[in-house]
Amino acid sequence: IDHPFDQAFEQVVALVKERGWEVIAVSPQEGRIEATDTTLIMGFKDDVVIRVQGVGSRTRIDVRSVSRVGKSDLGVNAKRIRLFLAELKDSRE
């Protein structure tokens, strides 16, 4: 994204909190945010890790979401990532 690291990191942390995810760890030094999202239907806990890396005057954001239980997540984790990145993009505009 076209924002410096500090600004992007703050936006990511704010969006994680806005989405109601449980924040487990925030480390600006490592550029890492760890959180847990609980599914609405069954109450399953899914782990989310977001890496924020400064690249010159821009920032790269990587998101990983994984279910703790079950063999298939029925696309929930991919959808969570897509929605998060779309909301992050909208919050910057």
Where are these regions (language model features)?
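Ser/Thr-rich, low-complexity intrinsically disordered terminal regions
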Residues: I1-E93
